[in-house]
C-alpha cells in the first residue's frame, strides 16, 4: 500500500562545500528571523531587529556563522534572495525547488568578516520575491539564526590587538559601508542593471583615517541573461530573423568604477540556479554556488588618496553586453588608523586598458560555430601614510575568457565550451621594506550540451549534459596556502509538456577537494533520480591520497567533447 504523501519525509537538498572551521567552544545562538514567504513579489523586504548577544560568557568571537534553514512543499519556481544587515549584504542565495512531499535545506555561511557590523544594533532585511497562484503554491518557511563562537583565551589578545600593521591585513575591517540601494524599497537592496548602457551609482563618504579599503561585490544574473554564457551573437539572430532569443553573445563582465574611473572588474562564476537548464540535475545536490553565491573582492587601497578628503564620492556598476537583468551591489570594507584622525595618500599609477575582444563566426542558416575570446587587465599603485608609516599597495587584475559554441540540428542542438581565468594579486610594501602579497588564481570551466526534440502537442524531450568547475588557489599574508577544486558532471533528460516537467532521468557526480595545509576536506558524491548512490568524505591532509585524487580528477576533468542549451528553464 503506498505511503500517504503527508507521511513521506521531506527530501533534504544540499550544496557540496567544506564545513566551516569553528572552535570547540559552545556557540551563543540567536534566532533572528522566522517568516513564511508566500506572495512576496514586489513587496517590501521582511525586517527584523538585530541586537548583539549580551548573555555570552565572552564578548570576543573567533567565528560567526549565519544559518538559513527553510522548508517548502508542493510546486514552486527557484527564487533568488538576499539577506542584508544595516544595508550590507551578507548572503545571496537561491531557493531549492520543492517536491509535493516537501523539501528542507540549510545554508551555513561564515560571516566573521562582518564582525564590526555585528557589534552594534542593526536592521536585518530579507527579500525573497515569491509568487503564489493556482499552479505554483509553494510557500517558503524560513528560519535565520546566528551562531557566535567565543574565542579561546589564547586568541583573545591576538584577535583584539590592532596596534601592529600586519593585524590590519589579517583581521576583519573596522567599518563596512553598504554600497547598495537605500530603503524603503519594494524589492531587494541590490541595484538592477538592465542593459549595457545602464550604470548604477551609489554615493558614499569614508572616515578620513582609513588606511585600507576592499570592495566586496555581490552579483547574480536573471531573466534574459540567466544563461548569458549560451546567448547567441546578434548577427546570427538578425540573419535568421529570430525574435525573443537572448542575444549580445556569450561574454559578460561587471565593471566597477570610482568617480567614473574603472577600478576593477568581476568576471563571474557561472552559477546555475536550482531551476536552471534541467531542474532535475540539481536534485537533491544543487549546483556549485547556488546556495551561497560567491563574492568578489577588489582592492581599493591604491585609490584611498582620492577619497580621503571627507567629501562624497560615487561607485558605479556596469555590465558589458548586459541584457535584463543583473542584480549587483557591494560592501566597502575599511580599516581605520586608531592612532590618527587623518591619513593621507596618493594614486601614483593606474592602468585600465580597453577590453580586447575577438569574435569569429561561421554559420549558414541556423547551424554554425562561434568563437569568442576576450581579455582585460587592471592595475593600480598608490600609497597611504598613517601612524604605521608609508604603505604602498599595488593591485593587479588579469582576466582571460574563451567561449566556443556550436549550433546544429537547425538550432535545436547547442554545445558550449567556456573557460574563464580570473587572477588577482595585491602587493603591500610595508615601512620595513618587507612586501606582503595576496594572490588568488581562479579558473571557471563550463561545458554544456542540450538537444531539443519536439514531440508534438506542446511536448518535447530535452537532453542535457553539464560539466562545471570552480578551481581556485590562494596564497599570501602569512596564511597557509589553500587550493580548491570543485568539479561537477551531470547528465539527464526530461519530457516537458506545456512548460511543466512530466518525467525525466538524471545522474550526477561531484568531486570536491579543499587543501588548506592544516585543514583539508574531500568529498566524492554521486546521485541519480533523488537517490544518493555513494558519498565518500575525508578530512585528512594526506599527500599520498591527494596525489591519487589528482589522477582521478585528471580523468574526470577536462571532460571529453560532450555536449548546452538555448536558455530553456522549466519547473
Curated annotation (Swiss-Prot):
Indicate whether Hydrolase appears among the record's keywords.
yes
Q: Write the Enzyme Commission number(s) for this entry.
A: 3.5.1.52
Alphabetic keyword roster:
Glycoprotein, Hydrolase
Any transmembrane segments, and where? none
GO molecular function list: peptide-N4-(N-acetyl-beta-glucosaminyl)asparagine amidase activity
Catalytic reaction annotation: Hydrolysis of an N(4)-(acetyl-beta-D-glucosaminyl)asparagine residue in which the glucosamine residue may be further glycosylated, to yield a (substituted) N-acetyl-beta-D-glucosaminylamine and a peptide containing an aspartate residue
PTM summary from the entry reads: Is highly glycosylated and is largly resistant against self-deglycosylation.
Pfam families per UniProt = PNGase_A_C, PNGaseA
Sugar-bearing residue positions: 121, 143, 197, 241, 318, 367, 390, 423, 457, 481, 524, 529
Q: Which InterPro entries match?
A: PNGase_A, PNGaseA_N
Assembly and partners are described as: Heterodimer of a large and a small chain.
Q: Which PANTHER family match?
A: PEPTIDE-N4-(N-ACETYL-BETA-GLUCOSAMINYL)ASPARAGINE AMIDASE A PROTEIN
Q: What is this protein called?
A: Peptide-N4-(N-acetyl-beta-glucosaminyl)asparagine amidase A
